[in-house]
């Protein structure tokens, strides 16, 4: 992808990128470098993203890999961690093309740590069969990558190649085109005003939704904005029951944990356990070998679930365990932790813990959403003109549980591929692609975006095996297209008072006992973001069962009437929009969790008839879209 690729072609296309994590920054740079007009909207400052907080690194098998490592091994590790639910084609793309995009980062100023011989320093993390984790600044990989990309973006802006608009919260997507079904721009809040921007395509790179839960590694901006934006224009979403909880987030003081923003989480990187740290309970017992043969290096879902089960067994389900990194210092020598993990050493010290001699209290925390907006391998969603990449998207590459350090890599590989799709370099149509049954690992059908004609949202979307029990109804705010004069900005034409957004509605199974609906809602109390996060943690967190999930659904439905008042679309309060997005995301997650009655990967139901296991074939995939019922394929 170079500027020459568009030479002699039509006028430059305009790509509107929403989000400034690794997928958004990298794709914006690539599109601009190829000659496209690029507008980059970021909700806060450019550094406000999950990427900035990423510590462990980026997994990749380089031209000169660690001894014994291969791309095939990376593929196998990813498929195994994904519990047999991965789209194998997407995994092959991810692992095969990784080295290309690592080199691409180098073009934009990213530098990774080197070992004493001047070669890339490769770390080992849980569920990887060989050291293949690139890191920067020791344990500050995300910050290092983000800083370099942001600097280059600002250089591009100074050269007139990218238009950056910070503190621009996108509230809706504009629809236009001949049938009024194509995304033609984005409406956003900026400086106390509603504004809009036209684009030939909009790329959602908005990250995840960790703020759904009381304890999260995500910053305050992670409020499911992209998922909600896509859903409201009819895009299909999938795999929402799979939310990964990182096993080792440092437990803050009680008053800090209750802060709704949870804006400064401290994730204790997977790499610390890769270097030899172990987990102990309050009795000093190393318990992970009791739950999995790989102990602390088991996949994340296994470690998080084991911690939760062990705490419940000890009668302290809301408690914490301890990470013992002192063993690393004993094995590697004094000063190793400070050199290998300088940021963590500083942060734990600021929290009053000397982790070279003391234990660190940790507990699972919401970390990464495997599900998201359904896309093909070039970022195309089921809605024409709408692309998605990174955590907000669902290519199927992460399966039911993400392998450590594959998230930044996903943003790179599929961010670049989304730009290729936008520029028409993918060999297919740059427009939306319908859902169709495709072959995955083991040959079972799965719902995957591919092909060329736009999807008809009036028809039924299918997945393989099981139907949802009722239609999902969510009238979308009808948006007029932004005028086609290609002015960069225009007053937002979204008139929220014309059509009022309403909550998702479906029939829940009856709760035990009379008046259970009212009782459940009474326990939930009045809506607040803190109440929502506590509800989701208690009833749809690491450990789930049918009763808890149904209770969550009832409470969420009751809250929805209060959180979606008439003035939401026109509100100038960002938190009003965020609350609406979080509530929608919570409803979709809970509905998906209810439908998957068996345990799989990060979705653990204690009432499942079988224990979670790595399966050989691609499992049934739950895909939903607005006003669409799911039926047997």
Predicted regions and their residues:
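Glycine- and aromatic-enriched mobile tails/lids
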Residues: 2-13, 30, 34, 45-46, ...
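Short beta-strand to alpha-helix junction loop
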Residues: 86-99, 133-151, 165, 216-224, ...
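FAD-site-proximal beta/loop scaffold in flavoenzymes
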Residues: 172-191, 196, 353-397
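N-terminal Rossmann-like FAD-binding beta1-loop-alpha1 element of flavoenzymes
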Residues: 14-40
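An anion/pyrophosphate-binding glycine-rich loop and adjacent beta-alpha core
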Residues: 46, 229, 235-353, 421-427
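Glycine-rich active-site loop/strand segments that organize a redox cofactor
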Residues: 60-94
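Conserved redox-cofactor binding core of oxidoreductases
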Residues: 106-194, 198, 205, 249-258
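Glycine-rich loop(s) and the adjacent beta-strand/alpha-helix scaffold that form part
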Residues: 201-256, 266, 405-421
